[in-house]
Design a protein with these regions (language model features):
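Fungal secretory targeting signals
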Residues: 1-21
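Structured soluble/peripheral alpha/beta segments that form catalytic or ligand/cofactor-binding pockets
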Residues: 21-374
Length: 374
C-alpha cells in the first residue's frame, strides 16, 4: 500500500531553479566528488529546503521529528517516538561509520526509535533507493522511495506529517505535529539574513520548536500511540560531522506556558557554541547564541563527555532572559538510544523562573561524544 500523500509528493513537478518551488533528487549511491554549494545565510523563503546543492561525499542534510508523551498523574508514562530522514555522502555523517564499518548501505537512511510506556525500546534503520525532496514556501516534503516512508510539510511550517508504510519491517502508521510557536535559527528568528551555522560547518533550523504531536502506529500487530509535545528540526553540513563537533548537548521541553530549546556544541578545538530559544505562549522571549549554560549532573557527568563517560542522570539548563533567570533540570526516565557516541533520553522537566517554581513538564534531549577514544 502507498499512502495518498506519498503518491502526491512523488508526482510533484517543480522547477529546481525556483526559490518558492524546488525539487531535489538524491540517488541511493552517487560518485560524490562533485563540488557542492552549501547555503549558510537564510533566505526570505525556503526555510526547510535542502541546503547542499548537490549533495557530495562530505555533506549531509537531515530532517528530524519527535514526540514525547506528557506524563500521567503519577508522572511515569513517557512513551516517545523519533524519526530522522538522512541524506548523506559517504563521509558526511561519518558517525554512521560506527554502525556501518563496511560502508553505508545507501546515501538515504531513515532512523526510527521509540520507547514503549514501560520503557522498552524499538529501533529500525531503513535504506532508501531514491530520495525526492520538494519545497513549497518554507516547508519541505520528502519521499524516501524503497522505504515506505515520507514526510510532508505545510508551506507556512504550521504542520508536518510523517508516514511509515513498512509492514515487512513490522511498522505502519503516521506521526503528526502542529506548531504552537514560531520557527527560529540558532541566533535569531526565522527571517532573511540570519547566519544558519550553529558551529562552523554545521547549520541548523528549527521549524517546529514545540507543538502538539500525535503518533499512531501498528508495530508487529500491536498498537502504539503517543500524545504529547512534538518537535521538528533540520540539520545540515558541508564537511564530515566529527570535523565540526567534538561533543554536543541538545534538547527541548515545555513548562507550563514556556517552551524551551537548548543547544551547546564543542568544536574539536573545544570552542563552545550555544543557542537558546524560549517562548511564552506564542511569542519569542529569546532566540540567540548566548545567555545559556547546559551541563550534565549526577553519575557519569564528566564534561566534556567522552565515549567512555556513560549516560548522565540528567542535565541542568540555565537561561538568562528578559523574563528572568530560568533554572531548569531535565531528569532521565527513559533512554531511547544508548550508543557510546550518541545517546537520547526522555524524562521529567522541572525548574524555576527567578526562583519561583514552574509547572512540571516533559522533555527530550541528546548527547553526542565524538572523541576518538575507543
Amino acid at each position: 500500500m502507498m499512502f495518498p500523500s506519498i503518491a502526491h509528493i512523488s508526482s510533484l513537478a517543480l522547477l529546481s531553479t525556483s526559490v518558492l518551488s524546488q525539487r531535489t533528487v538524491v540517488p541511493a549511491h552517487f560518485d560524490g566528488t562533485e563540488q557542492s554549494h552549501t547555503q549558510w545565510i537564510s533566505n526570505a523563503t525556503g526555510f526547510d529546503a535542502p541546503m547542499n546543492q548537490p549533495l557530495n561525499d562530505t555533506s549531509f542534510d537531515w530532517w528530524y521529528f519527535d514526540v514525547v508523551q506528557e506524563p500521567d498523574a503519577q508522572g511515569q508514562d513517557h512513551p516517545s517516538f523519533a524519526m530522522t530522514f538522512h541524506t548523506t555522502g559517504a563521509d558526511g555523517m561519518d558517525v554512521f561509520q560506527n554502525l556501518f564499518p563496511l560502508g553505508l548501505p545507501s546515501n538515504l537512511l531513515i532512523q526510527i526509535n521509540l520507547n514503549w510506556p514501560d520503557g522498552g525500546k524499538d529501533a529500525w534503520v531503513l535504506a532508501g533507493d531514491e530520495g525526492v525532496i520538494t519545497v513549497e514556501g518554507d516547508g519541505a516534503s520528502g519521499d524516501f522511495r524503497g522505504t515506505g516512508c515520507a514526510f510532508e510539510g505545510e508551506a507556512d511550517l504550521s504542520e508536518y506529517v510523517v508516514y511509515v508504510d513498512a509492514p515487512e519491517k513490522g511498522i505502519v502508521g503516521t506521526f503528526r505535529v502542529k506548531s504552537d510557536v514560531p520557527p527560529h535559527y540558532p541566533c535569531g528568528p526565522a527571517e532573511a539574513g540570519q547566519d544558519m551555522q550553529v558551529v562552523p560547518g554545521v547549520g541548523w533550523m528549527n521549524a517546529i520548536p514545540d507543538g502538539y504531536g500525535e503518533a499512531d502506529f501498528t508495530i508487529r500487530g500491536k498498537p502504539f500511540s503517543v500524545r504529547g509535545r512534538g518537535y521538528h528540526d533540520h540539520n545540515y553540513g558541508s564537511r564530515p560531522f566529527s570535523q565540526s563537533a567534538y561533543s554536543a548537548y541538545w534538547g527541548h521541553g515545555r513548562l507550563g506556558e514556556y517552551a524551551i530549546v537548548w543547544l551547546t556544541v564543542l568544536t574539536p578545538t573545544l570552542e563552545e557554541h550555544v543557542s537558546a530559544y524560549v517562548t511564552k505562549g506564542t511569542e519569542i522571549v529569546v532566540a540567540r547564541c548566548g545567555g545559556i549554560t547546559i551541563r550534565p549532573y549526577g553519575a557519569h557527568s564528566t564534561y566534556p563527555p567522552t565515549r567512555r563517560t556513560g549516560a548522565p542522570e540528567g542535565f541542568t539548563i540555565s537561561v538568562d532572559t528578559p523574563e528572568g533567570l530560568f533554572e531548569l533540570q531535565a531528569e532521565t526516565i527513559n533512554t531511547q538510544i544508548n550508543f557510546d557516541f550518541y545517546r537520547r533520553f526522555t524524562g521529567r522537566f522541572t525548574g524555576t523562573l527567578d526562583g519561583e517554581p514552574l509547572p512540571d513538564g516533559v522533555a527530550l534531549w541528546e548527547q553526542f561524544a565524538l572523541d576518538k577514544d575507543e
